[in-house]
């Protein structure tokens, strides 16, 4: 049972380590984000979409690009080079006359029935193609829709100049090299290179159909969240009527929920849980499953401002417990319809292994965190990233941080020893304090907190007094004379 007030526990109130890990090993670089967003716009909006619009049906039903996935939700951990894009389309139909069926065993899917009364004049204009998408009972066939979109993609590629195994696309003076698209479920995956550089980015382009604000029986609604939703042509294996089942997407609503001014503070915690997942190589534990656990908690805590303003460390510990609890129950209910278990397809032994490993990690962090602020780094960072913690300190010479007078001392030398063998607990505690000291930003910490850190480090230095060379002791003495003269 998870303690619902765990986030109030004092020993988790210090965010020093959390902030360090987030800043240096999780936060995406602004320059990369800006550059890749421009490349994305060039390739898709300015390059491919105009060519697709040469097909008259596509031109008439295409609405816009919806940028999806964890990157655009603000919960992505890895390098910003993988993107999910929905090509949003709206069929020429009167949506008030559409029949959307949700009363079947696949809770995250719907069947769409197109009545003759719902067809608008534009439907008749394109009836030669559109009528082929309907079954004898007028259900919309997602497989035929997807085949049509594949033909659009193929014809678009034919309009590009081919060179070896690539297709060339020039936009705004930049020469992009695009590989032949690959089909992956509902997506068409494209790999893009710029000039002679290796793969710049990959994008999953997913065609989807808008459902507007149609109310779906049994599904959640939120008064402050847009009711607009869409469906994608995601196939279901071993299902007799699979070609008529469309997968629901509530991405826009989820993005809106996570963008709330208070709720958005949880995004970095989502990323930290994903970072742990990646470090443990738990690939079957999809990002969406983790985000869903957060969505449930957000809905439950929507009026609890204190929760969203709690320390990120305490929220990380709390949400990690929530994840463990869900894995122990072998169930992560779909946020929009809890009749669907997102991890129901995973093998029980796999889920049990994940839960047990995460419990051991949580116990270890909980045991050590009072004495070692960086206890979580042991599980969140790989060996290379752990070495980079040392570089944070050593770079103080050039970045002007508070450790610029300590980089030559014996304490800093002992940091290297701690990183190499991790055997000396006393030095580990000092290491945590030194790294903490190295990452403090003057603009983000008040005077009282800064003094507290200095006092703590002085206490550690006092315990090691006999090991500190006389020259370094003299440096400390001179520093205090200058400060208090």
UniProtKB/Swiss-Prot annotation:
Pfam families: Mab-21, Mab-21_C
Residues reported in the UniProt entry to bind GTP: 204, 247-254
One record GO biological process: innate immune response
Catalysed reaction equations from the record: GTP + ATP = 2',3'-cGAMP + 2 diphosphate; GTP + ATP = pppGp(2'-5')A + diphosphate; pppGp(2'-5')A = 2',3'-cGAMP + diphosphate
Residues annotated as binding ATP: 70, 82-84, 271, 274
GO molecular function, one term: 2',3'-cyclic GMP-AMP synthase activity
Domain of life: Eukaryota
Binding site for Mg(2+): 82, 84, 204
InterPro entries to which the protein is assigned, alphabetical: Mab-21-like_nuc_Trfase, Mab-21_HhH/H2TH-like, MAB21L/cGLR
EC annotation from Swiss-Prot or TrEMBL: 2.7.7.86
Entry keywords, A to Z: ATP-binding, GTP-binding, Immunity, Innate immunity, Magnesium, Manganese, Metal-binding, Nucleotide-binding, Nucleotidyltransferase, Transferase
Residues that, per the record, bind Mn(2+): 298, 304
Role this protein plays: Nucleotidyltransferase that catalyzes the formation of cyclic GMP-AMP (2',3'-cGAMP) from ATP and GTP and plays a key role in innate immunity. Directly binds some unknown ligand, activating the nucleotidyltransferase activity, leading to synthesis of 2',3'-cGAMP, a second messenger that binds to and activates Sting, thereby triggering the immune response via activation of the NF-kappa-B transcription factor.
Similarity comment: Belongs to the mab-21 family.
Protein name stated in the entry: Cyclic GMP-AMP synthase-like receptor
Source organism per UniProt: Trichogramma pretiosum
Record gene name: cGLR
């Amino acid at each position: 049972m998870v303690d619902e007030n765990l986030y109030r526990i004092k020993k988790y109130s210090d965010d020093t380590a959390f902030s360090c890990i987030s800043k240096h090993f999780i936060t995406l670089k602004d320059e990369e984000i800006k550059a890749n967003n421009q490349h994305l716009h060039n390739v898709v909006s300015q390059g491919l979409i105009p060519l697709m619009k040469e097909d008259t049906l596509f031109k008439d039903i295409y609405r816009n690009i919806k940028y999806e996935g964890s990157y655009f939700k603000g919960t992505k951990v890895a390098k910003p080079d993988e993107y999910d894009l929905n090509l949003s389309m709206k069929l020429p139909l009167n949506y008030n006359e559409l029949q959307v069926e949700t009363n079947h065993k696949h809770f995250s899917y719907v069947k769409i029935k197109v009545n003759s009364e719902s067809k608008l004049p534009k439907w008749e204009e394109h009836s030669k193609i559109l009528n082929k998408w309907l079954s004898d009972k007028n259900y919309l066939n997602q497989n035929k829709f997807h085949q049509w979109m594949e033909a659009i993609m193929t014809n678009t590629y034919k309009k590009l100049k081919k060179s070896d195994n690539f297709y060339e696309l020039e936009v705004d003076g930049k020469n992009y090299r695009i590989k032949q698209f690959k089909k992956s479920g509902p997506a068409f995956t494209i790999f893009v290179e710029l000039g002679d550089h290796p793969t710049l980015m990959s994008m999953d382009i997913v065609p989807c159909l808008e459902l507007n604000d149609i109310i779906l029986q049994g599904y959640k609604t939120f008064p402050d969240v847009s009711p607009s939703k869409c469906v994608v042509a995601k196939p279901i294996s071993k299902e007799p009527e699979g070609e008529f089942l469309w997968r629901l997407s509530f991405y826009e609503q989820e993005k809106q929920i996570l963008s709330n001014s208070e709720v958005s503070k949880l995004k970095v915690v989502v990323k930290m849980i994903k970072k742990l997942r990646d470090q443990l190589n738990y690939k079957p534990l999809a990002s969406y499953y983790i985000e869903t656990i957060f969505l449930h908690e957000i809905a439950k805590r929507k009026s609890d401002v204190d929760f969203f303003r709690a320390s990120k460390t305490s929220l990380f510990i709390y949400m990690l417990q929530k994840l463990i609890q869900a894995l122990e129950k072998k169930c992560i209910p779909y946020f929009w319809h809890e009749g669907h278990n997102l991890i129901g397809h995973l093998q029980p032994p796999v889920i049990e292994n994940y839960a047990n490993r995460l419990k051991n990690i949580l116990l270890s962090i909980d045991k050590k965190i009072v004495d070692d602020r960086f206890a979580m780094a042991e599980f969140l960072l790989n060996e290379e990233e752990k070495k980079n913690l040392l570089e944070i300190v050593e770079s103080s010479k050039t970045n002007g941080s508070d450790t610029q007078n300590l980089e030559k001392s014996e304490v800093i030398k002992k940091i290297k020893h701690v990183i190499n063998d991790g055997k000396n607990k006393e030095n580990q505690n000092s290491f945590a304090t030194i790294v903490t000291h190295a990452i403090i930003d003057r603009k983000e910490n008040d005077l009282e907190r800064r003094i507290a850190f200095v006092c703590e480090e002085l206490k550690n230095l006092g315990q090691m007094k006999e090991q500190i060379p006389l020259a370094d002791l003299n440096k400390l003495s001179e520093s205090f004379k200058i400060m208090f003269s």
